[in-house]
């Protein structure tokens, strides 16, 4: 039975270079997602594209497939030097750059092409060594790429393919001047294949595309609704005093297999982490203060199931491919309505269902009208029974301390995942047909 997120378009029918198809087959990719089915037939002809689709729809595989295919069918010039990559893939964050590199691994193995990573937060020497040996594909963030360019570690004169991923996020983070700097150091747009992908093709993104690309064709996959039809949304109005107790109560009732909790500040994230760690949850923290190597390790632990809950600022809300996230909690409603969509888009991916639970607290309830206007529907409201919330919670741990192993309130002293923690209070939720006025 065909699932809703896969089309009838086969990769085998696209005329791909055999070793590219081999890499796709090795990972079980046989049918295209909608963005792949629309983008690949266009870009494989050599036409530049500007693609838009919801997160989790296969944008990364689309541009990786096109990049590898183009490089294999269009050999490098004889004048190319060792420090000149043939393709460059730019991402707004270190985490996304690493994710793209990991996603490229099967194609690297099947084609024999080489790739290198360039991002901040890690020592220069290790990355420099890779580029000194020569790579075909450069994947990285703009700041470190510019550093390497100015130090002559890399040269962009032989670039044949350019990919700009999460272009709208590039604007949000103020990287557009860096991108334009790099574009001006590459061959002219007509001398290379250019691909831009974004969650939204806003006016400023389109302007960038037409300025530095060769008449790109727009490829748009419109969602059924901005928040995704497989995501069950829910909203609570907690007081500031009950907010943490409500979160911990919901977590114990739901026992999410894999959850992300978003907060608006790093200090709030640390506070949430401290409460959950003290309660012996397997929880990780991801914010701007966490060293890069630790961030990578935390993401790996979360992806592999060694961590059940990830507490994060919006650094984790865009671009990362974390499979099977079952729940997203907006502990704080985001200030930007678009960030609400990107946050809850961590769940309900690739045809799976998911749950999004948001708190409209005293501090951030003011953001709710703009969010509901942007998503074009009210978030279903639920009430809760204050008397049913957990109490006598342990004091939160400080970030520098190691979470203790003993002293759990639950029977058997650990999470069993089979309803052994606390009976579900069926009176906790009282769904409302309309949002409170």
Swiss-Prot record:
Protein's organism: Photobacterium profundum (strain SS9)
Superkingdom per UniProt: Bacteria
Annotated EC: 3.6.4.13
GO biological process, one term: RNA catabolic process
Protein name (database record): ATP-dependent RNA helicase RhlB
Keywords: ATP-binding, Cytoplasm, Helicase, Hydrolase, Nucleotide-binding, RNA-binding
Subunit structure: Component of the RNA degradosome, which is a multiprotein complex involved in RNA processing and mRNA degradation.
UniProt feature, compositional bias: Low complexity: 400-424
Family to which the UniProt record says this protein belongs: Belongs to the DEAD box helicase family. RhlB subfamily.
Binding site residues for ATP: 53-60
Motif (DEAD box): 165-168
Motif (Q motif): 9-37
Localization (cell): Cytoplasm
Biased composition (Basic residues): 425-437
SUPFAM superfamilies given in the database record: P-loop containing nucleoside triphosphate hydrolases
Positions of the UniProt region annotated as Disordered: 395-437
